[in-house]
């Protein structure tokens, strides 16, 4: 039973800096400060700020070239330094020095926020199309700068944006860090069959996919005992983050937090509405599947929460790390190209930190590091789902390899589009298995796949409902633990319905998910990514050669073009609900296959 990190790999960043005491690291911190100071001086020297509309001049072109070049130069080095620090803060929240350095770097980086606001106002004043005629740098960065110009319509005054940039480090950023620290350091006592055991909360949550029903229930009970210990602190953090977001969104002229989120993700409201309509109409089908899963586990009615991630009784035993890698390696190899070598490159290069341990944050993510190299963060539990998560995060790493030749301003990805490659790679693993397996093995894989789809469609919908209500109520007052718990239960009731045993619903999901502790909705973009990824995979299956001819370029342009423009490359109209219905139909077909296989048992 994999519960803690023993022999699993950890990433190695010592080739970049040997330690925080290394001269190279100290120089990198000094350089970040110096680069920001030079940027501030350059913006003042060139008077980069809102101006009266007028015809552009060659001097404007020279100013734009200088500013864009300097911004990219700063980000090239600063992004590496930030990732290096994060490689410690995310894996060891007990490391107080790393936490302090993260805060120090954050204060330096925050000084660029008002500069970005000034650049947005300046570009909007003169026109990005007009500036592109006199500035090669603007022409090269037309997409990101056009979006920046649009952002200028939703900015506070220059002074206010500058003040907010200074305050955010001690406001929402600090609140989010608090949630990460208190939850990552939490432990729980689990009544395991061989006796009680104290485990990091990340390892406890990993037991949700354990083969033994008694262990799953014990882990759930331990969670319910543990989360109240940090709930009050997390409620304060939630109120701080959402309260700040409401004020800033209002001062920036956004009609709602959702409008701000859609803009940040380069997704239009018609696209979002089409997707949401398809999601809501799919909920009854998901509820039916959850009840079918419940029957296979011997339950009547809805599925208990503690069995949401339960493997089927005949599912394969625990997947070893090496076997999980082989599953991903084989699936990536079926696609070919540079993706085929992604697993070995990440393993050999020690990009991956795989196992849970005390002080390590929960979840999984991938962050770009140096050149086209990434750092892949996992909490491997030994489940089949862990293998799919590994494929997902290595998909992000592959995406980063396709972005590496772009400038930092060109490769800043909105979340919805950042999920494109990760979902596609996860789907490769699922489809390869479905083609290879039959009978009970096929049913077991469908079970894992559909529980993932249910998370991204149904659970994410519950998170969206919850967060929407939190934003609304936070406009009037702060929310306590009991109220947040009630909102979470109601959101789960509305999304899951009779698909789960509502008596076992998880009221503390808002405590443990870091996604809530940010200004924007950190939920619906996952649904976008899943359904868009399924649409891409269908295109790949129809014409693999044509798909491969466009895919890498689309990935490299994810920070440049809108969601609608990227979809159009493959002939998709994402403003049309039919696209989203077709993607959900792929999931429905898997539910049908699940039911047929279950009936044949």
How should each PLM-predicted stretch be described?
Residues 253, 381-401, 422, 427, ...:
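Active-site recognition of the HExxH zinc-binding catalytic motif
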Residues 414-442, 449-455, 529:
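Post-HExxH zinc-binding segment in Zn-dependent metallohydrolases
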Residues 330, 334-341, 367, 396, ...:
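Conserved helix-loop functional segments at active or binding sites
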Residues 317-319, 352-373:
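Catalytic zinc-binding patch centered on the HExxH motif and its immediate surroundings
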Residues 1-313, 596-601:
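A well-structured
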Residues 295-340, 399, 445, 450-456, ...:
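Long, K/E/R/D-enriched contiguous segments that form extended
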Residues 316-321, 334, 369-391:
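Short pre-active-site segment immediately N-terminal to the catalytic Zn-binding motif
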Residues 3-7, 14, 18-20, 138, ...:
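C-terminal, non-catalytic "cap/extension" segments appended to globular domains
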């Amino acid at each position: 039973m994999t519960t803690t990190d023993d022999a699993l790999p950890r990433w190695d960043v010592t080739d970049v800096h040997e330690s925080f005491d290394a001269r190279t690291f100290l120089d990198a911190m000094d350089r970040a400060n110096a680069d920001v100071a030079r940027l501030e001086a350059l913006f003042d020297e060139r008077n980069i700020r809102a101006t009266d509309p007028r015809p552009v001049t060659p001097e404007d072109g020279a100013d734009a070239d200088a500013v864009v070049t300097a911004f990219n130069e700063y980000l090239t080095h600063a992004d590496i330094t930030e990732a290096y620090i994060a490689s410690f803060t995310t894996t060891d929240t007990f490391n107080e020095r790393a936490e302090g350095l993260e805060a120090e770097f954050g204060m330096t980086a925050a000084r660029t926020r008002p500069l970005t606001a000034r650049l947005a106002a300046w570009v909007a004043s003169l026109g990005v199309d007009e500036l592109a005629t006199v500035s090669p740098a603007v022409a090269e960065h037309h997409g990101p700068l056009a979006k920046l110009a649009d952002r200028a319509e939703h900015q506070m005054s220059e002074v206010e944006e500058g003040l907010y940039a200074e305050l955010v480090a001690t406001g929402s950023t600090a609140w989010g860090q608090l949630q990460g620290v208190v939850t990552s350091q939490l432990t729980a006592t689990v009544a395991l069959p061989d006796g009680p055991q104290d485990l990091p909360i990340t390892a406890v949550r990993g037991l949700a996919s354990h083969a033994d029903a008694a262990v799953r229930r014990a882990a759930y009970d331990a969670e319910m005992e543990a989360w109240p210990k940090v709930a009050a602190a997390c409620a304060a953090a939630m109120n701080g983050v959402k309260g700040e977001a409401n004020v800033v969104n209002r001062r920036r002229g956004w009609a709602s937090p959702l409008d701000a989120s859609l803009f940040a993700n380069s997704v239009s409201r018609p696209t979002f509405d089409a997707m949401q309509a398809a999601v809501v109409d799919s909920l009854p089908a998901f509820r039916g599947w959850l009840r079918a899963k419940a029957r296979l586990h011997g339950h009547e009615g809805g599925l208990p929460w503690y069995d949401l991630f339960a493997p089927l009784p005949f599912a394969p035993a625990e997947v070893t790390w090496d076997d999980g890698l082989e599953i991903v390696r084989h699936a990536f190899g079926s696609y070919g190209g540079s993706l085929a070598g992604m697993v070995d490159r990440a393993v050999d290069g020690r990009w991956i930190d795989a196992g849970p341990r005390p002080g390590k944050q929960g979840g999984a993510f991938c962050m770009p590091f140096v050149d086209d190299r990434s750092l892949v963060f996992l909490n491997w539990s030994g489940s089949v789902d862990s293998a799919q998560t590994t494929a997902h995060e290595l998909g992000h790493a592959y995406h980063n390899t396709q972005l590496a030749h772009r400038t930092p301003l060109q490769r800043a990805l909105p979340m919805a589009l950042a999920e494109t490659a990760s979902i596609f790679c996860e789907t490769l693993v699922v489809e390869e298995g479905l083609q290879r397996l039959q009978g009970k093995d096929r049913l077991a894989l469908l079970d894992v796949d559909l529980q993932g789809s249910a998370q991204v469609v149904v659970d994410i919908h519950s998170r969206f409902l919850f967060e929407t209500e939190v934003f609304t109520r936070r406009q009037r007052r702060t929310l306590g633990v009991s109220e947040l718990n009630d909102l979470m239960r109601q959101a789960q009731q509305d999304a899951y319905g009779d698909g789960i045993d509502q008596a076992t619903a998880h009221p503390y999901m808002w405590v443990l998910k870091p996604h809530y502790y940010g200004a924007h909705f950190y939920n619906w973009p996952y649904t976008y990514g899943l359904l868009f990824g399924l649409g891409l995979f269908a295109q790949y299956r129809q014409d693999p050669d044509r798909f491969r001819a466009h895919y890498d370029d689309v990935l490299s342009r994810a920070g440049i073009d809108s969601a609608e423009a990227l979809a159009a490359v493959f002939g998709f109209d994402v403003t049309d609900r039919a696209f989203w219905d077709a993607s959900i139909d792929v999931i429905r077909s898997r539910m049908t296959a699940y039911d047929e296989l279950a009936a044949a048992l």
